[in-house]
């Protein structure tokens, strides 16, 4: 009888802990989704309030970037693209203006989806980052506004949830690659070693 009671208590306690973790994860996921939706809305409004002709001017684009940053310091840089994927103007620390993005996965996606939030990728800057891009319709056809989200700021947002003294929060994409850095170790875009275990646990719950 004692063995049965101990086993039942251990199982009951474990189930409680797992449900608490799931509830915390769901709540934090909603917070992250809201953050990304707000930044996409900022970018969409900025594009709708201007034009390709205006934002192709470096000063006009710099003014827009200042307005974006006044809403959120999570914006790291911004660029404007024509309908062929040419990077017409850029505000940020990299030399990206004039480059051709027509074959980039994010550019192909935003042509179809109107708003696109990427996974972490390297791109021309050869550094892990992710972007939000929006499509806008102009007199001469569609054009695109793209902003990079500050990786450290986003990482801090994801890590802001605390689960006990040793728990941690991080994001992985559908392929199981780290999208934020775990405190326990691991680099952006590396495979998460426990990804298959998480998938199995989720299937058992559902």
Name each model-derived stretch.
Residues 1-57, 66-76, 116, 129, ...:
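Juxtamembrane extracytoplasmic/periplasmic/luminal helical "stalk" adjacent to the first N-terminal
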Residues 14, 18, 22, 40, ...:
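Short, structured helix-loop boundary elements
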Residues 48-52, 85-86, 176-177:
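Short, solvent-exposed secondary-structure junction/capping segments
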Residues 69-160, 165:
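Extracytoplasmic/periplasmic ligand-binding sensor regions of membrane-associated signaling proteins
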Residues 91, 152-206:
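Intrinsic low-complexity, intrinsically disordered coil/linker regions enriched in small/polar
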